[in-house]
Amino acid sequence: MAHPLLDAIEMARFVRSCKPMLKGLMAFLSLTFAPCPDEAPQIGVAEAHIWQVDLDKPHKNYLSASEQERAHAMRHPEKQAHYVAARSALRLILSKYTQLAPQDHDISFGPYGKPQINGSDLHFNVTHAQGKALIGMARVPVGIDLEFPRAVTQLDRLIADYFSAEEARELMALHDEEKAKAFL
C-alpha cells in the first residue's frame, strides 16, 4: 500500500520485560524507530508497537464524519491540521493490522472516554505534541504520552510527593541535569 503518509510514519516494538518498571505502573522508554513496514505487523500479547508520526508531512484525510466535525470546531489551523494528520495516521496504521480500509474502522469511545475499535481485541492510544504523534498498539489496554524536555520547577518537592521512597532516593542521588531528565 503506497501512501505519502507512510513516509512520515515509523514503528518500534517494545516487548514487556519480566521485571516491572516503577512497580508496573509506567515504563519510560528510549526507542529506536524504523521505517513503516510494508507487511502487516503481528502483535503478541506481551508486545506493544509504538508508531511515530510526523504531523507536518503531507497526508490524506481518512476521518469519519464525527472526527471531521471535531476538526472543524478547532479554532487554531495548526492544531486542526495536526489533529487531522494524527487521526488519519491512526486509521492508516489500524489498516495494517485489520486489513480494512482506513475509512472503514468503526471507532467509538468506551465508558471512560478511551477510544476503541468496535468488534476488535486490538487496543490503541494516541498522543500528539509539537508536530509529532505517538500511537501505541497492543492486545491489552495501552496508554501513551509524549512529553518534550522542559524546565521543571520545585523538582525535589515533586519527587518527594509523587515517587516511592526508594524511587525518590534513586532520583535524589542524581546530579540536577540527570535528575530532571530521569524525572521527565
Predicted regions span which residues?
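Extreme N-terminal basic, low-complexity initiation segments
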Residues: 1-7
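Core catalytic alpha/beta fold that binds nucleotide/phospho-ligands
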Residues: 9, 14-18, 22-184
